[in-house]
Amino acid sequence: MKLNRKALVLAAALAAVGSFAFAQGSSESAGSKTTQAAGPVHVTLWYPATQTEVGPLPNDWAGYQIIKDKFNIELEAQTLPSGTQDQDVKIQAAAAADDLPDMFTAGREVWLRLANNGMLADVTDLYARMPNRTQLMFDEGAKKYTSLNGHNYGFATPAAVSRNEGLVIRKDWLDKLGLEVPKTTDDLLKVLHAFTYDDPDGNGKKDTYGYGAFVETNNYEAYPGRRLEPLMGAFGVEGTWNMTKANFGLQINKPEFYDFMVFMKQIIDDGVIDPNWMAYKKDDFRGAWKQGKFGCFREQNSALHSENNYAPFDANFPNGDIIVIDPVTGPSGKASVGPAVRNMRVWCISAKAAEQGKAEKIADLFEWMSYGEGYMLCGFGREGVEYTLDANGNPQSVPGDKGYNGPVGQTYIQLRNMAFNYTSDMELSSRYPSYTTKVSGKHMSSLETLHNMQGRKWTDAVGMESMPVPSTDLKTFYEQGLAEFFSGKRELTKDNWNAFVKQFNNMGGKAWEEEGRKYAEANGLLK
C-alpha cells in the first residue's frame, strides 16, 4: 500500500523535531517505473566529500559531461557537511520539507527512520541492473543491512577501511617534558596534566591542552562518541553495546560506565581537555591539532598523515612528531581503541525520485562508477592530469598540487567514496602513498600509519552497526543527561547516576536493550 505524500512529509517533520510515527513503506519496486522525458534527466546528488579540508567537486569536473553523454543525466552534485551529525540534520530537514535529493547517503539511524516513513525507494530489483557493483560490494551482509520486511531501501557500501583510527600523541612534547608514552589511565592523567600546565611547546604561554576531541556519534558509538572511545575502552565500555553472550546489554547499564564517567569528569575538572570539545565540529578539531592546541587524541590515518592533511602541521611544527600508541589500560586491565565494525554507508534513492522514473538511471550511474572509466575518474581523476600509470598499470598521483593527492587534485575526486570498495591493494597503495614532507623533510606514509593502527587492540563488534536504534526522545535524554554530568549542571554522584540510569530505562532504555537482545540472538551476533 502506498502512503499518502502529505502523511510522509508530516512523519518526516516529526522525525526532525524528535517524534517519529513509523509507517509501512511502499513495496513498489523503484525499477518498475521508467523515465519518459526525452531531454536530459535532472538528478540531484548529495555526497560526503572524500576530503573535507579542500573544496567541493568543481563545476568543470569532466564527469558531468561524460555522464550526460552516456546516460542522458544532468547531474547536480552537492557536498554534505563534514560531520555525520550535521549530515543527519540536513537530510532530516530536507525530508521534513519533502525535498530530499534524488540520491544521497545517510547513516543507518536516519536511513531506518526515512525507510519506515516511506521516504525511500524500494531498490530490491536494482541489484540485477548493477552486476559489477553487486559482485564487488553487495554481499548478503550488505543486503541484509538495508533490508526491511524482505525489501531493500538502500545500498550499503563500504564507507572506509576498517580499524583505520588510533590513539595518537605528540612525541616531541613527551620528549621535551621528559615523559614516557602513557601505558595506563594513571599515566595518561599525568601526561595530560603536563601537556596542559608545563608549556610543552616552549612558547611561554598557557595555550595547550592534554586531550582533544569533538562529539562524533553513530548508532554503534553513542555519546560522547568516537573521539573518547580509547578512554571508554580502558573501562570496558567502548561502543554502544556489549556484544558478548555473557554480558550482553547497553554499555550505559554496566557498572563500569560510571567508572568511566568519574574518570572523564576528572579530566574535565582538571582542565586538561580542550574546553571546546563539545562545540567543535570535525574541521575545527582537525584545525586545532594542526595548530598545536592539544597533544593527545584519536584520529584517522589519512587525516593524520596523508600529505595534504599533514602539511599544515608540518609547516607549523617542523620538529613536531605525532605517533600512534596503544590504548591505555584501565584499573581492571582493559584497553581498546574502540569497537571494530564493518564500516558501511547507505546510499539511498528517494521515493519521489523513483516516482519520477529516475531510479534506473541512478542505478546505471552507480554501476558506471564501480569499474572502468567511471571508477578511474571518480577514484583518481583524469589520466595525465591528476594521475599517471606506473609500469604495473597502477595509478600514481601527479606531483604537485594538481595530483589527486594535492589540494587542487583532491577536489576532482570528491566522489571517490561512491567508487571505492576499500579492499584492493591498488586502492590502498594509491590512496596512501609515501612522501617526503616539504618543510621538515621527514619520510611519511599514511599506509604505514594505517597498518600501525590496525595492529592495536580493538574490540571485535561486527554487527553492532546494524543493531536497533533508540527513539529520538530517548537518544536526546541520554545525550543531554551525560552532557549535564560532564558540565557539572548535574553533580556526578553514584546516587544521581543510578537515578539517571533508572529514568533512562523507564523511558524506554530497557525496552531498547531487549529489542537489541532479540535482534542480536536472531542474527548470531553474540560472541
Region locations from a protein language model:
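Secondary-structure transition/capping motifs at alpha-helix termini
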Residues: M1, K68-I73, A97-D98, E180, ...
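Conserved N-terminal structural module of periplasmic/extracytoplasmic solute-binding proteins
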Residues: L3-A12, F20-D187, R227, M232, ...
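Extracytoplasmic/periplasmic substrate-binding proteins
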Residues: A49-A62, D175-V181, V215-I273, A303-V341
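Secondary-structure capping and boundary motifs in well-ordered enzyme cores
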Residues: N59, E256, W289, V341, ...
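General small-molecule cofactor/ligand-binding pocket signal
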Residues: E74-L80, P275-N276, I323-I325
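Helix-loop-helix "hinge/cap" segment bordering the ligand-binding cleft or interdomain interface
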Residues: S147-Y223, W241-A288, F297-Q300, C348-K361, ...
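Structured mid-domain segments that build the active-site/substrate or prosthetic-cofactor binding neighborhood
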Residues: K293-C348, E355-P407
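Conserved small-residue motifs centered on glycine
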Residues: D364-K489
